[in-house]
UniProtKB/Swiss-Prot annotation:
Its EC number is 7.1.1.-. It catalyses: a plastoquinone + NADH + (n+1) H(+)(in) = a plastoquinol + NAD(+) + n H(+)(out); a plastoquinone + NADPH + (n+1) H(+)(in) = a plastoquinol + NADP(+) + n H(+)(out). This is NAD(P)H-quinone oxidoreductase subunit O. NDH-1 shuttles electrons from an unknown electron donor, via FMN and iron-sulfur (Fe-S) centers, to quinones in the respiratory and/or the photosynthetic chain. The immediate electron acceptor for the enzyme in this species is believed to be plastoquinone. Couples the redox reaction to proton translocation, and thus conserves the redox energy in a proton gradient. Cyanobacterial NDH-1 also plays a role in inorganic carbon-concentration.
């Protein structure tokens, strides 16, 4: 009997990073600068709020907050 752990939905306060493969195939990637900073793909960023299918993410750097589609974000798991 194989049981899978259900995926936790992302919510306010979740630590995340951007999945580069999913982002590169998105319509948002076509409309944005192709030279994005590495820190968004490495994480962690913190979700400040969610509206419909978008999340506002704050990075631990002195940069503006950014909105990403929820399906482009993955939960950040700190490695020990």
């Amino acid at each position: 009997m194989s049981e899978t752990i259900p995926k936790k939905p992302l919510k306010k306060g979740s630590l995340v990073f951007v999945d580069k493969n999913i982002y590169d195939k998105s319509i948002e990637a076509l409309a944005s600068d192709s030279d994005l900073p590495a820190y968004i793909f490495e994480g962690p960023g913190e979700i400040l709020g969610i509206k419909e299918e978008y999340a506002q993410v704050r990075w631990r750097r002195p940069v503006p907050d950014v909105w990403f589609k929820l399906d482009q974000l993955k939960e950040y798991l700190a490695s020990e």
